[in-house]
């Protein structure tokens, strides 16, 4: 095969995925832009990778993937580190059921605000700074758990640690800027799923660390405190790695590209406006509130549920509870892959149907879990429920990147915050008072999942249609270029600030499924007045 030369991104020719990668420095966080740079993976016109090699560390795409999911997983470990140790902590601090429930609400409420902020940080400063600084700044709060002495301190510290869950937004934003739209479901699902797996890892890790420390001579009430130094140090290590090895965009870091004039410097007010005025944003906020939201709520109660209901030992209850979080290893990527597969044949309409089916099934399995009377039945129902909820998360963020190109960060932040808000609301309604037993709470949570999934039928893209309605027949408004180009005014278009949106629109034409035209309009010929 002949050598390929030329500027990558000028066309799909000349990008074979076999050229030597030399443009990006591993040692320095400052990555210099080089228009002649070649990538280790084949890329599209936006320099996004068109293939996903899971066991590769190719820079910048796969290196970013691994840094992103590991840092997010670290935050999950610390946020839910207290959950498997609650049977010990509640005796030490004299916690009531309401205290434990309030702490669960607090642990996921903090990131409602921080995820909104992280969305803006990603849009304006880049995901590398957002992820690295949040992970490192939250480390002191993790260490602080070792020094709490009462219920108020326990609730407050769990609230503060929960801020770090905003790394989910940087994770999903980062993947959406590094990988092509045809594989974004799988990539987003894998990154977030493996990150969420931290909720399962901590169910195994913290009881083991606690037991090791206790056997080394510490008392039970001292051992659980020392155990929190493990996730605290993980925060510091991952923050340093992300800051030094991460990269905002395929071509370099955002600040460097803005100075070179290759990336438009946007304004917060405008990206916020386009995010909040797009009705699809709020539907996905609700949907994610009852997929990711219920997963977070379950992480807080599932170990205690098995410990109390079936009178299991602490480590046994933790092992079973870990299965819920560990299902993220394959369930969330499977949801994203299912969405990509459906889109290959049915476009965006296939993605929407996939989301509705998976999330509704998860809700029904949740109802079954709440009504299970034997340990075996409860475990089976829990595993199926976890697979449905987590696959629905993957299917959701296989669609979110298409809602807006310009306001991707803000919309990702709002959707992610919806997950935390849904978790806090669910925890408050069903698991923080004596009105419901844990079994009843799980049952009603399942009913809420089924009901809150119905609004997905209202999501309609003029260029692709909805679950029940076809796309627009308008030759202008029914195009991808018009949908994404309409986020820029005429003055901004004259400055060519919308070119990134047009390139994205060209690559997103595959979401039309079998309706895609055989002869697509080249991106350079797309009118500037869309």
UniProtKB/Swiss-Prot annotation:
GO biological process, one term: nitrate assimilation
Disruption phenotype: Impaired in the high-affinity nitrate transport. Reduced growth on low-nitrate media. Reduced nitrate uptake and increased lateral root initiation.
Modified residues (Phosphothreonine): 521
InterPro entries cross-referenced by the UniProt entry: MFS, MFS_trans_sf, NO3_transporter
Keywords for this protein: Cell membrane, Membrane, Nitrate assimilation, Phosphoprotein, Transmembrane, Transmembrane helix
Subunit architecture: Monomer. Heterotetramer composed of two NRT2.1 and two NRT3.1. Interacts with NRT3.1.
Protein name according to UniProt: High-affinity nitrate transporter 2.1
The species this protein was found in: Arabidopsis thaliana
Phylogenetic placement of the source organism: Eukaryota, Viridiplantae, Streptophyta, Embryophyta, Tracheophyta
